């Protein structure tokens, strides 16, 4: 399993990406078995030291590819631009930066990217922050787009405009996986803008679709 790891230090934190292995797929020893595979990004021109997260990994031929959501400030700008970062590995433990894609027109932080192929076309699902700022709609949404993607170079380009998967916050941070029958199944985070006043939690997972 791959996930984001961020130890707190005086209410500040740095974001690393880690791998953890389980013999049965259910039991994980998070204290002893996790291994940092991507250290915090210190190059501000590449990504954000804190807000780089949500790894998704797949295998292509004899190589693994990892996609991350992040943001950075372009030269000459004072605003963040959302982006995805690509890393590759031969053994799933030693990773190297490969490529990136960004678009300043699509929000200012790209969360939970998921890139996959359907009928010879690549689909990108992600959840940009501050995508809409009209005062009427939620600023964060889950969107999708057909993209051009080369597995060898990890060169990606959004071919068309992004489209909202579902309106509102009832579906956010959506991710897909393949079931045992070969179907691609999507599950998201169903949440509301603020937590209930008498509870310590917010949201739940959606039904698979």
Residue ranges and their predicted role:
Residues 1-54, 59-107, 119-167, 188-209:
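Beta-rich carbohydrate-recognition and catalytic domains
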Residues 50-56, 111-114, 172-175:
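Beta-propeller and closely related beta-sheet repeat lectin domains
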Residues 173, 183, 209:
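Glycine-rich, aromatic-lined ligand/substrate-binding cores of catalytic
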Residues 179-180:
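Structural secondary-structure packing elements that flank or coincide with functional cores
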